[in-house]
């Protein structure tokens, strides 16, 4: 990503794979890819890719050429690049990290900036995988239902952005950073229809625990490991959804100094009985605590409850 023009090639940089359809004159005609917290590939298929490519080919014939060359912006514009070294490979997820670093340095960053590329489910839309702009389901009482969308509708645009895939829908939602109503246009039985998506506070939020770019966000919980199985939880009297993270072989210095040991089972924080996975737990800490905060990890050790106080130190 070192020399990629970020002003032109905009996509979700946390993805394992992303595709953009670009015309010879430089127009981005569409995007393909996207994922959710459940699966890295549940939102994509070869049929869906072909469907999006056909839409891009049609757009190439119909859309006017660009009036001017897009601005050029690369990771070299972010001061944080210096810490990676002049020859280091810049991975996709590091673009998000560099952008975050720049905003933090200017005092313009807040937790609300974490919610990038919200999935269409956030506005009540589930799209077909093989036909990425066809509505498979509309959630009851959602923004999509209130706007008038129904199963089988074919979405043309969201916020003025053409939609032919899950990634297109995410991009359109990503560009809309406010709670103001968002325009949508769709086809029903060949007839064009339009409506407004009325967005509630926090509409961008979703499970972002899969995002690699969050790993460097502080504070670190300083614990890591694997989830207990359902059978192991049941044997300990824990519910199936209860947090039960077994501390791994390597115990970080902050955790070790606090008294946490290998195979300790983290089941809560500050007395809260959390229902989440071990992958979601670090994000919970990052969203609810700051560097320097003292937390009490609620543990099970050899079947007995143990409370350990740990200071969420910053990285060296």
Task: Kindly give the residue locations of the regions a language model identified.
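A short, hydrophobic beta-strand/beta-hairpin element that forms part of a small beta-sheet core
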Residues: 16-35
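PDZ/PDZ-like peptide-tail recognition elements
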Residues: 90-137, 196-245, 307-316
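Thiol-based oxidoreductase modules, predominantly thioredoxin-like and allied folds used
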Residues: 1-4
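Short consensus segments that form the blades of beta-propeller domains
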Residues: 8-12
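PDZ/PDZ-like domain segments forming the peptide/carboxylate-binding groove
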Residues: 117-157, 161-164, 221-268, 272-276
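PDZ-domain C-terminal substructure recognizer with occasional recognition of PDZ-binding tails
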Residues: 156, 171-210, 258-261, 267, ...
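A generic structural motif
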Residues: 35, 161, 169, 199-200, ...
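Sequence context surrounding c-type heme c attachment/ligation sites in exported
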Residues: 35-124, 129
């Amino acid at each position: 990503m070192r020399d990629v023009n970020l002003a032109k090639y905009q996509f979700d940089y946390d993805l394992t794979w992303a595709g953009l359809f670009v015309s010879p004159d430089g127009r981005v005609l569409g995007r393909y890819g996207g994922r959710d917290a459940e699966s890295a590939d549940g939102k994509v298929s070869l049929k869906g890719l072909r469907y999006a490519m056909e839409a891009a080919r049609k757009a190439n014939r119909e859309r006017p050429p660009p009036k001017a060359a897009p601005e050029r912006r690369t990771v070299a514009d972010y001061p944080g690049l210096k810490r990676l070294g002049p020859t280091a490979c810049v991975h996709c997820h590091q673009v998000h990290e560099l952008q975050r670093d720049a905003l933090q340095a200017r005092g313009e960053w807040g937790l609300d900036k974490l919610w990038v590329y919200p999935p269409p489910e956030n506005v009540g839309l589930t799209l077909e995988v093989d036909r990425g702009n066809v509505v498979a389901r509309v959630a009851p009482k959602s923004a999509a239902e209130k706007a008038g969308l129904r199963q089988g509708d074919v979405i043309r645009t969201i916020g003025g952005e053409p939609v032919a895939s899950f990634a297109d829908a995410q991009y359109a939602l990503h560009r809309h950073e406010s709670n103001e109503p968002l325009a949508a246009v769709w086809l029903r039985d060949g007839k064009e229809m339009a409506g407004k998506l009325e967005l509630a506070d926090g509409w961008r939020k979703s499970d972002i625990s899969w995002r690699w770019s969050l790993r460097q966000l502080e504070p670190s919980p300083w614990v890591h490991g694997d989830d207990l199985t359902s059978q192991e939880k049941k044997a300990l009297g824990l519910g199936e959804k209860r947090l039960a993270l077994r501390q791994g072989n390597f115990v970080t210095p902050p955790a070790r100094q606090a008294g946490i040991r290998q195979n300790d089972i983290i089941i809560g924080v500050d007395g809260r009985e959390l229902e989440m996975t071990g992958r979601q737990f670090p994000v919970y800490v990052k969203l609810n605590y700051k560097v320097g905060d003292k937390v009490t990890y609620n543990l099970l050790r050899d079947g007995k409850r143990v409370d350990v106080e740990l200071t969420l130190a910053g990285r060296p």
